[in-house]
Amino acid sequence: TIKEKQASILALFEHLTSVPKQHIPEKERDNRLHDVGHLSRGKLFSLFHREHLEEATHLYEILHAAKNFDDFLLLCKQARDFVNEGM
């Protein structure tokens, strides 16, 4: 249901700035995410920096192209582990 989908997305925002307890090894990450994560966690993010904007745009395009909701959620969970929390 829509309510269940909303709840699963809302859970991604809990403890957003906390360091993840478990890291997904780079080999196990989805290949579509291999080109994001240049701006490491804890660094200042700003869309006024061209490199930051390009990375955020690329991440958006990856998430937007997800095959279905479950694929989208998987990509979000994996990206949350290593992508800058401001992004």
From Swiss-Prot:
Does the UniProt entry include the keyword Hydrolase?
A: no
Q: Which GO terms describe its molecular function?
A: oxygen carrier activity
Q: Which GO terms describe its cellular component?
A: extracellular region
Q: In which tissues is it expressed?
A: Hemolymph.
Against Pfam families, the record matches this protein to: Hemocyanin_N (PF03722)
The answer to whether the entry has keyword Ion transport is no
Instruction: Enumerate the UniProt keywords alphabetically.
Output: Copper, Oxygen transport, Secreted, Transport
UniProt-listed InterPro entries: Hemocyanin_N, Hemocyanin_N_sf
Cellular location of this protein? Secreted, Extracellular space
| Its job | Hemocyanins are copper-containing oxygen carriers occurring freely dissolved in the hemolymph of many mollusks and arthropods.
Protein family (similarity comment): Belongs to the tyrosinase family. Hemocyanin subfamily.
How does the record describe its quaternary structure? Polymer that contains six different types of chains (alpha, beta, gamma, delta, epsilon, and zeta).
Q: What is this protein called?
A: Hemocyanin alpha chain
Species source reads Tachypleus tridentatus
